[in-house]
Design a protein with these regions (language model features):
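Short S/T/G/P-rich N-terminal loop/turn motif that feeds into the first structured element of a domain
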Residues: 1-49, 57-67, 83-100
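Conserved short loop/helix modules at catalytic or binding sites
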Residues: 74
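Arginine/glycine-rich "motif VI" loop of SF2 helicases in the C-terminal RecA-like domain
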Residues: 78-82
Length: 100
């Protein structure tokens, strides 16, 4: 299992534009082979700052999503005008357990 942590801040008044892109990608990502889940959190301390955590079956699944044409269009739009800053971390899960 692989986790992708995407931390980002949007430029002023660009959060709505980001969430429009998210809506365009929702159906696409759900049909992506190896996709497990995605969650997004807004910072209470820093305005227009978010963290998105997606879970994938394996590294190949993440690589395929990165190459997805619609995703690439959204990435480029984000880099050009939506994001003030961003950081992406990709990590392999070596342990996963819980009470459920």
């Amino acid at each position: 299992m692989v986790i992708v942590v995407f931390q980002f801040s949007t430029n002023p008044k660009m959060s709505d534009e980001y969430f429009k892109e998210v809506e365009l990608l929702k159906k696409e990502i759900k049909n992506e082979k190896g996709f497990i889940s995605a969650e997004r959190y807004a910072s209470k301390a820093v305005k227009d700052s978010y963290v998105s955590i997606s879970t994938w079956k394996d590294k190949k699944s993440v690589e395929n999503w990165h190459k997805n044409k619609r995703h690439q269009l959204s990435q480029n739009k984000g880099k050009e005008k939506i994001f003030k800053s961003f950081r992406i971390r990709v990590a392999e899960v070596f342990k996963d357990y819980g009470s459920d």
